[in-house]
Amino acid sequence: MVEDGAEELEDLVHFSVSELPSRGYGVMEEIRRQGKLCDVTLKIGDHKFSAHRIVLAASIPYFHAMFTNDMMECKQDEIVMQGMDPSALEALINFAYNGNLAIDQQNVQSLLMGASFLQLQSIKDACCTFLRERLHPKNCLGVRQFAETMMCAVLYDAANSFIHQHFVEVSLSEEFLALPLEDVLELVSRDELNVKSEEQVFEAALAWVRYDREQRGPCLPELLSNIRLPLCRPQFLSDRVQQDDLVRCCHKCRDLVDEAKDYHLMPERRPHLPAFRTRPRCCTSIAGLIYAVGGLNSAGDSLNVVEVFDPIANRWEKCHPMTTARSRVGVAVVNGLLYAIGGYDGQLRLSTVEAYNPETDTWTRVGSMNSKRSAMGTVVLDGQIYVCGGYDGNSSLNSVETYSPETDKWTVVTPMSSNRSAAGVTVFEGRIYVSGGHDGLQIFSSVEHYNHHTATWHPAASMLNKRCRHGAASLGSKMFVCGGYDGSGFLSIAEMYSSVADQWCLIVPMHTRRSRVSLVASCGRLYAVGGYDGQSNLSSVEMYDPETDRWTFMAPMACHEGGVGVGCIPLLTI
């Protein structure tokens, strides 16, 4: 009964001590150290570790399954553990009690192996991050092999990207010289190698052979057949390659040198040479010609116009036009060919595709997509073209298709988790990242990435700003987005993403607001091409230098007014 004037109190009060769970675990850890109330002993070799079943089951999935599913071990006082380092097991038992773990160069691999065995995914991820942050030309090959053994796909792809980016330094390491033939062949054949010229690849291969000349000498013909000798300078072929004693005493090697020299002496025979050996590599750090394809004019008409920009000469030149007018077109480069994919011709969304050969300045129709689409994202991964999302004339799409140049066929793969039109799409560390875009109702800041090994999509950290119709590209160990539209205004702001931190940060904005902008990497820099500033289409181009964090205006396009698709074909380094 409440007296008049007294404050009425609740009949039920909830009392809690938020720190009790963590404090309780600390007390249990102290009890364990005193050897009290322990009900299980883990034995590995000559080492024994006492613990409490309830703590192990609550903290470690492996023991949860063991102790709650009537396995034989659940009734044993002593459990024999196999295939783990004793110090790693002890550290992981301690982690079960206090949530703390010290990772260093000496224990990271044993901890990762132990965490994998005990199904502690968070620790496995932390160990992978530790290794990824410490990749170095002297250890990256070993880290890649370890990641493959432990089925750590993200670490494996990061190590692979690091190897490609730093190939010249990696080729000087003991790890490289100790590689088996099949691994060296796989490396020297990669399109993604960051080399100033094919001559560096030749020197790396020759150093590997000379490291064990007697055993590896017979491997030289196979190695040279996977190196793009025709792209070496004629003087280098004559003075260095042809004069090497290992090459001179091998008939097959001499034939490959002759083929490379013919490439320079008889240009008319180039189409008859093996395409692989005459195809430039496509690392974004080397120089490449930037092609601007299609787009819109000031009247809003779709264009078939194509022009090419030489970033070294800072000059645009007109190329042969496409067979079809295409705006909001996807562009990709594979095997030295430029593909114009889908888009909008002014009346219809397109599924058709055509390929441009810069040597002949001609366009050729190739296989059409399964779905018509414009405003989609287009990238190349492992020699395959991927198109993601877009707009089919009725709605935004989440569907994804991949194209094989070898079979001229398109295949539907796992769709994105969200419908996205006008998203930014780029390949980064062996994954396809899709950022922002819209679904017709809302504009996104969210990001997801595709693992082509498992055909699965996964979320990544969202951008700081929602945006669609923006540019996206990767360069070195970072991914970038710039410009776009956020629903209320046209953007000049740009962001940079680090996968190690899984977070975005702002970089210096562009000088100009740009929606419908294309972003592409060449010469170790980013080029923002064209766009729309809210009033008019743009022919201007800005170049971003990551070393100075500055944007600089470059020569404007000569034939376009904005909204172009772009692709970069590496320059022949001869």
From Swiss-Prot:
Domain of life: Eukaryota
Domain BTB: 38-105
Associated pathway: Protein modification; protein ubiquitination
UniProtKB keywords: Cell cycle, Cell division, Kelch repeat, Mitosis, Repeat, Ubl conjugation pathway
Kelch repeats: 289-336, 337-383, 384-430, 432-477, 479-524, 525-571
Job description of the protein: Substrate-specific adapter of a BCR (BTB-CUL3-RBX1) E3 ubiquitin-protein ligase complex required for mitotic progression and cytokinesis. The BCR(KLHL18) E3 ubiquitin ligase complex mediates the ubiquitination of AURKA leading to its activation at the centrosome which is required for initiating mitotic entry. Regulates light- and dark-dependent alpha-transducin localization changes in rod photoreceptors through UNC119 ubiquitination and degradation. Preferentially ubiquitinates the unphosphorylated form of UNC119 over the phosphorylated form.
Entry keyword annotation includes Cell division: yes
Organism whose genome encodes this protein: Mus musculus (Mouse)
InterPro entries: BACK (IPR011705), BTB-kelch_protein (IPR017096), BTB/POZ_dom (IPR000210), Kelch-typ_b-propeller (IPR015915), Kelch_1 (IPR006652), KLHL18_BTB/POZ (IPR030603), SKP1/BTB/POZ_sf (IPR011333)
Observed phenotype of the null mutant: Retina-specific gene disruption leads to decreased light response in rod photoreceptor cells and mislocalization of alpha-transducin from the outer segment to the inner part of rod photoreceptors.
Complex formation: Interacts with AURKA. Interacts (via BTB domain) with CUL3. Interacts (via kelch repeats) with UNC119.
Gene Ontology BP, a term: protein ubiquitination
Residues annotated as domain BACK: 140-242
Tissues in which the protein is found: Predominantly expressed in maturing and mature retinal photoreceptor cells.
Protein name per Swiss-Prot or TrEMBL: Kelch-like protein 18
